[in-house]
C-alpha cells in the first residue's frame, strides 16, 4: 500500500491542468504534487483517442515509477479517451478524471439554455453524449468547439486583442441563443475567466469543475487512508516540450516560479 506521504500525479495535455493543480493545492496543502504537461503533443482535442490513450499510459507509468499514490487526469479530452483504460491498468490506484459540469449547469440555469465551451474531442465523445442524456434532458444545451484558444493560453496569452476576439466569437452565439449558464469544458479555459466575465452579463453563471475534482480527490484519498499529514507539500513540474517555455509561463498561470524538468517519453 502507498504511503500517505507519497506524491500525487497530475497530468494535462499542456498547461491547462495548472488550474486544477491550484485547486488541489488549495484544498490539500500537505500533498506533494507531480505535474506533467504533455506540451510537446498538444492539442489533445484534435488527436485520435488511440494516440491520447498511449500518451496517458506513458505518463501514468512515469507517475507509477515515481511512487505516486493517486493520479488526476486534469484534462477533459484525456479523461474521455483514457480514464477507463487507466483504471484497468491500475485498478488499486485512486484515479480522478474531468468531465464538463453538465449536472450543476442544468440545475443552475434559469433560462433553460446552457452553453458549453470545449474542445472538439470532448464534444464529439460518447462520454459527453451520455452526460447530456443523463443530466440535460430538461434543458437545451448548445455546444461550441473552441479551436485556437488552447494554443493562445499555452503561450501565456490571456488578454491580447487576438484572444479577446477569438473568445468573443465563440461566446456571442451562445448569449444570442439565450444561454444564462456557461460551462468551461476544458481545463485551459478557467485562465480566461476574467476576460470572459467581462464579456457576459452579470447574471450569466460560469462553471468549471476544478474545485469539484479536488474534492473528489480528497474523498478518495480519505477513503483509502492516504491523506498526507505534516508540513506543506511542494509541486514539481515536467514537460514533453522545451522546459524553458513552461518555466517562463509558470509565473503567469501558477503565480510562482519553479524548476521544470524534461519528460522525454
UniProtKB/Swiss-Prot annotation:
InterPro entries: Asp/Glu/hydantoin_racemase, Asp/Glu_race, Asp/Glu_racemase_AS_1, Asp/Glu_racemase_AS_2, Glu_race
Family, per entry: Belongs to the aspartate/glutamate racemases family.
Pathway: Cell wall biogenesis; peptidoglycan biosynthesis
Biological processes annotated in GO: cell wall organization; peptidoglycan biosynthetic process; regulation of cell shape
UniProt keyword annotation of Repeat present: no
A GO molecular-function annotation: glutamate racemase activity
Protein name: Glutamate racemase
Keyword Cell wall biogenesis/degradation: yes
Highest classification ranks of the organism: Bacteria, Pseudomonadati, Pseudomonadota, Gammaproteobacteria, Pseudomonadales
Amino acid at each position: 500500500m502507498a504511503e500517505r506521504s507519497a506524491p500525487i500525479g497530475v497530468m494535462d495535455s499542456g498547461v491547462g491542468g495548472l488550474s486544477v493543480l491550484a485547486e488541489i493545492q488549495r484544498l490539500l496543502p500537505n500533498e506533494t504534487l507531480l505535474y506533467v504537461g504533455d506540451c510537446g503533443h498538444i492539442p489533445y482535442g484534435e488527436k485520435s483517442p488511440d494516440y491520447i490513450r498511449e500518451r496517458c499510459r506513458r505518463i501514468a507509468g512515469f507517475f507509477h515509477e515515481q511512487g505516486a499514490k493517486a493520479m488526476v487526469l486534469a484534462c477533459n479530452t484525456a479523461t474521455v479517451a483514457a480514464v477507463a483504460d487507466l483504471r484497468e491498468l491500475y485498478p488499486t490506484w485512486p484515479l480522478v478524471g474531468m468531465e464538463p459540469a453538465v449536472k450543476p449547469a442544468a440545475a443552475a440555469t434559469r433560462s433553460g439554455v446552457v452553453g458549453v465551451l470545449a474542445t472538439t474531442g470532448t464534444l464529439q465523445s460518447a462520454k459527453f453524449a451520455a452526460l447530456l442524456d443523463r443530466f440535460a434532458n430538461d434543458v437545451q444545451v448548445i455546444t461550441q468547439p473552441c479551436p485556437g484558444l488552447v494554443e493562445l493560453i499555452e503561450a501565456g496569452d490571456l488578454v491580447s486583442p487576438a484572444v479577446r476576439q477569438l473568445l468573443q466569437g465563440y461566446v456571442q452565439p451562445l448569449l444570442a441563443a439565450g444561454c444564462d449558464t456557461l460551462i468551461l469544458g476544458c481545463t485551459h479555459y478557467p485562465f480566461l475567466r476574467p476576460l470572459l466575465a467581462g464579456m457576459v452579463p452579470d447574471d450569466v453563471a460560469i462553471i468549471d469543475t476544478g474545485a469539484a475534482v479536488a474534492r473528489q480527490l480528497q474523498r478518495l484519498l480519505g477513503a483509502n487512508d492516504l491523506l498526507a499529514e505534516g508540513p506543506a507539500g511542494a509541486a514539481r513540474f515536467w514537460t514533453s516540450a522545451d522546459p524553458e517555455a513552461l518555466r517562463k509561463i509558470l509565473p503567469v498561470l501558477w503565480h510562482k516560479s519553479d524548476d521544470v524538468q524534461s519528460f522525454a517519453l
